[in-house]
């Protein structure tokens, strides 16, 4: 999948100085390229037989929605604070460039539902790790993680549950 790197724009010093942001928007505007990424993910995730895909705000929603639709399974949104109605469960976590909080609706899934967590990019693993813990806290059975892009030098996999499935398609 390295040939798809040319569709990912690098933006220096965004969102903070010293960060090189990987912008995936050029992929989303090219249907053939996006399809080339979605089919392998769809095939891999389908073998795990999840009940839901959980997408992380906000860029994780894009592909998670498409995958949930294609796999005919439910979509769960993991959001930043004060974006979800009703009772929520939350967790604070550290980012590569600061600190943040994620929330999930308290009764969004049946207990022990199999959940595949999806985000567009794996960096330090802080966001994905926090989201995975949140799924467990909400009663879900986290079965794995899937990402479009991984920044391998940041060793984000080390902050994820090593007993679970972890898949990325494009590695930097």
Curated annotation (Swiss-Prot):
Any Pfam family the entry gives: Pribosyltran
EC number: 2.4.2.7
Enzyme class: transferase
GO molecular function: adenine binding; adenine phosphoribosyltransferase activity; AMP binding
GO cellular component: cytoplasm
GO annotation, biological process: adenine salvage; AMP salvage; purine ribonucleoside salvage
Record keywords, A-Z: Cytoplasm, Glycosyltransferase, Purine salvage, Transferase
Catalysed reactions, as listed in the record: AMP + diphosphate = 5-phospho-alpha-D-ribose 1-diphosphate + adenine
UniProt-annotated location(s): Cytoplasm
InterPro entries linked to this entry: Ade_phspho_trans (IPR005764), PRibTrfase_dom (IPR000836), PRTase-like (IPR029057), UPRTase/APRTase (IPR050054)
Pathway connected to this protein: Purine metabolism; AMP biosynthesis via salvage pathway; AMP from adenine: step 1/1
Role description: Catalyzes a salvage reaction resulting in the formation of AMP, that is energically less costly than de novo synthesis.
Quaternary structure note: Homodimer.
Sequence similarity: Belongs to the purine/pyrimidine phosphoribosyltransferase family.
Name of the protein in question: Adenine phosphoribosyltransferase
Gene from which this protein is expressed: apt
